[in-house]
Amino acid sequence: SVNRGMTQVLSATGSERNVILLGAGSEESIERSEVHLEAETLARTIGGLEQHLGQTAVSGEIHYMAPLTLADASSAQARLRGVTERALLVHPNVRVLAGRFPNPGEVMVGRLAHHKLDAPEPILALGKPLRFGNVEFTIVGHFEAPGTVMESEVWFDRNDLATLTQRDSLSCVVARLGEAEFEDVAALTFRRTDMELAAITESGYYARLASFYRPIRAMTWLTAALVAAGAVFGGLNTLYAAFASRIREMGTLQAIGFDRPALLASLIQESVLATLTGTLLATIAGVFLLDGFTIPFSVGTFTLSITPKVLIVGIGSGLLLGLLGALPPAIRCLRPPHPPPHTA
């Protein structure tokens, strides 16, 4: 569920219709990218981009990571985005839930930003102050962008963020395709080599970002495997002790005519039934306690979702572990020789 949530939020953030213009060499880190302000104007001249009420869907943005000081004086690392209202043209999944878009001296926070900041939700209520450096801002809006990392961001007026970060450039320019193709936007990077630009689809950028977290996902599977191995060995110890006291009982049953395969199946059924009980209890606890739980990570937050597929994998793994843990003790219990059964 952790791996699925992390992968889903990164894949959902990127759109195939959005093309990002970055500084050459910064294709894997938008925060390190520097793009000249003129690139935004040039991008608007590309034909075939999406139009809204006569405005071309092009947004120059500043992305930055920095600590923010909240109303309760606590400080936490946050993901900041400096934007203009044109950002809504290229990110149509962003919807203002309450308040309005920020003006200078104001910010708009994502629906899940309090999880990223490890703060109670009321701290980011409308009208609350928020400090970046020595400058105080007022929260004037809340927004959502379902299933994306943007929901954990804090959006500033672009000029404010440029001033505070002392930069005269953008991090990127995002262009939304209409009839145009990716190659039409990429052609700008070849025409203006002096600007040292690189073009990448937004989905491609976040796919690269997802590959960066592949070792973390591998560690998640490794941790699960270690926990499973511990459960198997713990079960082996328990069942060896439980079945050892039943060797005489098994011998008696064999002596009166029950064969070993039938007794082996009986012992395994007992073990699997006990395992299934524990698995179902753990599944119920997971559904009620973890489903919808939000976890912060470096680029945002993701939400755990206990889907039917996750439930099937969990229950199936529990039954498999019960089977593996029962076989060796059951075979050992039935191994001692016994006299031939009596016949009438």
Regions found by a protein language model. Give the residues of each.
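Hydrophobic, regular-secondary-structure patches
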Residues: S1-R79, L97-R100, T163, F190-R191, ...
